A protein has these predicted regions:
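Specific aromatic-rich, kink-prone transmembrane helix
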Residues: 207-225
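Perimembrane helix-loop-helix junctions
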Residues: 245-270
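Aromatic- and kink-enriched transmembrane "portal" helix at the membrane-lumen/periplasm boundary
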Residues: 138, 162, 166, 182-209, ...
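Membrane-lumen/periplasm interface segments of specific transmembrane helices
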Residues: 19-23, 261-351, 357-372
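Start-transfer (signal-anchor) and selected internal transmembrane alpha helices
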Residues: 1-83, 355-368, 397-408
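Intramembrane catalytic core of multi-pass membrane enzymes that act on lipidic substrates
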Residues: 70-155
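Membrane-interface alpha helices of multi-pass inner-membrane proteins
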Residues: 217, 226-251, 370-371
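Transmembrane-helix motifs of polytopic, lipid-linked glycan transferases
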Residues: 151-176, 346-347
Length: 408
């Protein structure tokens, strides 16, 4: 039977994680909220190691819980109404944020059959801009053109796909843990729809990333090698925030002698990468080759034009300042590999010396890597910080059902 106390502590930490990324910025201040955000992520990761082992099959549904269907439908309708108001009030313009307009052009080129031209310069945006987004980031948005709808509905759909796992994990709200997760979901929905500065629905593409990383949490919990490979590929080829965790994951799987998992994941990831290069051309690799240098230059520009992104956000950039961007970038790059490696090294050492097996190491590893990476970004936009929150809430909610081996 799952450890009820650990499950409660996980849920409480998940609620605090959510609060720090939303209301905590206002009431605790950006500095305290940012430090607390990092600390709570570490606490969740450690609790996951000590908590019930997450095991599940793919029996998703709403069996025996008609209230789920009713409340889900009601919530989505209300959410749709609020999102529609946001989109009507703020037409999409590249002058406000160019991410989605760029992806719309990339998607239109793809739909029209100009696959090799997807990464050509876009002359109608900023008098010529080079698109650099990875395939799994922009491909979902290509559905907007044939569907003739606002591209931001893809972001909206991604948000709900990311929230569906923690929501379906709730049953009768008979425990404080379930109420804490439900409260976290409500806080996030309120924040995304009604708080004016996060811009998740109004301007960003981040909903698809939220969905990918929640899919990764489910895949890791399932232990299915093919699903893990697909999920890792989707995350790596959208926002590569957890790329530094891959060598550490490989080391842990080697320690556990999971040869089939290693070979399957490597095969799927390599297939997607090679396939992307063959279909879209070598420029698809620009985010890994050319973007890092431009990223530091962009950070210096943002410090001059919009310092509030750093000072009022959760990231650590406020402590480095504009004069130490290169130093912070070093912490970002090297730390993104070192932190997960040390985490895995500590886990393996514990297992070896104690003879006991830790639970959920892969999920805990991804969470701490994601949180560290986003906190150390030299340009730390607020909407990026909800990926670890949604990943963490999904992992925590899955512990509710570790005994039953399914979600009902």
């Amino acid at each position: 039977m799952p450890d009820i106390r650990t499950t409660f502590l996980l849920s409480l930490a998940g609620f605090l994680f959510t609060w720090l990324a939303t209301w905590g910025i206002i009431y605790a201040g950006a500095g305290m909220a940012g430090c607390g955000y990092l600390i709570v992520a570490l606490v969740i990761s450690v609790l996951l190691l000590r908590g019930p082992a997450i095991k599940l099959t793919f029996e998703f549904g709403i069996k025996g819980s008609p209230w789920k269907l009713l409340t889900l439908a009601t919530g989505m309708l209300f959410s749709y109404h609020l999102a529609r108001q946001v989109m009507d009030r703020f037409p999409l313009r590249y002058e406000d944020a160019d991410m989605l307009p760029i992806m719309r052009v990339m998607g239109n080129r793809f739909i029209s059959g100009d696959w090799r031209g997807v990464y050509d310069v876009i002359p109608e945006i900023w008098n010529g801009i080079q698109p650099v987004y990875l395939p799994f980031m922009w491909l979902p948005f290509s559905l907007a053109e044939p569907g003739d709808f606002d591209i931001r509905w893809i972001t909206f759909s991604g948000i709900w796909l990311a929230l569906i796992i923690p929501y379906l994990s709730l049953e009768k709200l008979a425990t404080p843990s379930e109420w804490l997760i439900l409260s976290s979901i409500i806080i996030l929905l309120w924040w995304f729809h009604l708080e004016p500065t996060n811009n998740v629905i109004k301007l960003t593409e981040e909903g698809v990333v939220y969905a990918y990383y929640v899919m990764l949490a489910v895949a890791l919990a399932s232990g299915n090698p093919l699903l893990i490979g697909i999920s890792v590929s989707a995350c790596l080829l959208s926002r590569y925030s957890f790329a530094g965790a891959l060598p550490a994951l490989g080391c842990y799987w080697l320690w556990r002698r999971r040869w089939r998992l290693i070979m399957t994941v490597m095969g799927v990831v390599v297939t997607f990468i090679i396939g992307s290069v063959l279909i879209f051309g070598p420029r698809v690799t620009m985010p890994f080759t050319e973007l890092p240098v431009k990223y530091v230059e962009h950070a210096a520009k943002v410090w001059i034009e919009n310092p509030e992104y750093f000072l009022n956000g959760l990231g650590m950039a406020k402590y480095f300042g504009p004069e130490h961007i290169q130093l912070q970038y070093g912490f970002l790059v090297y730390g993104s590999f070192l932190v997960p490696f040390l985490f895995v090294l500590a886990s393996i050492t514990y297992e070896w010396k104690s003879g006991k097996r830790l639970h959920n190491v892969e999920i805990a590893l991804v969470l701490i890597t994601l949180t560290y990476f986003n906190s150390m970004l030299v340009v730390s936009y607020l909407y990026l910080f909800y990926t670890p929150v949604l990943f963490g809430l999904s992992a925590i909610s899955l512990t509710f059902h570790s005994r039953r081996n399914s979600i009902r």
